[in-house]
Amino acid sequence: MSMQDTVGDMLTRIRNAQMANKVSVAMPNSKLRKSIADLLVNEGYVASAVVTEENNNKATLTIVLKYFEGKAVIETIQRFSRPGLRQHRGKDAIPTVKQGMGVAIVSTSQGIMTDRAARAAGIGGEVVAFVA
């Protein structure tokens, strides 16, 4: 059976791994997952994201999680737009997360970017998830 919501699965894997105090989490790779993971690395929520090729041409994305004084750096990570209800917003309607202390991940025509970058570029898109 095929997976319907790959981004939701990715966010759930990260959330579950952090609750279990795991060092890293592995998942099947895709371009969208890799770009979201790179954004999380750039924003400082995870330590690194590496794609490895398996022997049967299946790429695996491994995300190394970040902890500070025994607590996970990511306080909340939640899906906003979902396959059954897509949430598209214009540049003026992109929501802020925790009064600017968190990040909204936005899928735009120019790629995956944060809410701040999308507002600065003057473009809207699909609000994929919230991270704080």
UniProtKB/Swiss-Prot annotation:
Cellular component GO terms held in the UniProt record: ribonucleoprotein complex; ribosome
UniProt keyword terms in alphabetical order: Ribonucleoprotein, Ribosomal protein, RNA-binding, rRNA-binding
Source species, domain of life: Bacteria
Any one biological process term the GO annotation gives: translation
Record carries keyword Metal-binding: no
Gene3D superfamilies the record matches: 3.30.1370.30, 3.30.1490.10
Keyword Ribonucleoprotein: yes
Transmembrane segments: none
PROSITE patterns: RIBOSOMAL_S8 (PS00053)
Record note on quaternary structure: Part of the 30S ribosomal subunit. Contacts proteins S5 and S12.
Family: Belongs to the universal ribosomal protein uS8 family.
Function: One of the primary rRNA binding proteins, it binds directly to 16S rRNA central domain where it helps coordinate assembly of the platform of the 30S subunit.
Full protein name: Small ribosomal subunit protein uS8
Organism in which the protein naturally occurs: Psychrobacter cryohalolentis (strain ATCC BAA-1226 / DSM 17306 / VKM B-2378 / K5)
